[in-house]
């Protein structure tokens, strides 16, 4: 089971409840919080892009359902990657087009409804994840500082960490060949 970013949170939560259905777990650019203080520290250290802050406002959530300025998309991507040379007009257009697809903006708005309790769990619960697990992180991740993956490494018995230098949050875009090779090696 593979998850990136918030999908990583979904992946480890799914793994806790469905270990018998999984052969392995891959968590990419995701965080784990063992208590409210860790979550508050995360929010203090990691400055989200303006677009992410806007979805916390009910007014902007409704507004973004109808208009999504391209500049917000570009700013969100720029803050999520280490190497700014990959933030091309073509990439921004691709992301913007995806956001403009029917239902996407409503779904993004629903992210604001996720409660902080959804992000917090007992670190000891991770010990239940006994399947081989690969934890992947960018060392220059501005959205999820690498220190917020410690619980994965400390508590998951069969966890292996791979961190990429000069890589931000968008690992699949920033180092796609290296990531796919590392995943292939992990699976084999």
List PLM regions with ranges.
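Conserved alpha/beta-hydrolase catalytic His-Asp/Glu region
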Residues: 61-127
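Conserved alpha/beta-hydrolase "acid-adjacent" motif
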Residues: 142-148
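Short glycine-enriched nucleophile-adjacent loop
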Residues: 8-19, 25
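Catalytic active-site module of serine/aspartate enzymes centered on a nucleophile-bearing elbow/loop
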Residues: 157-188
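Conserved alpha/beta-hydrolase "nucleophile elbow" surrounding the catalytic nucleophile
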Residues: 3-8, 138
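Flexible "cap/lid" loop of the alpha/beta hydrolase fold
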Residues: 16, 25-61
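Short beta-strand/loop motif that positions the catalytic acidic residue
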Residues: 129, 135-137, 141
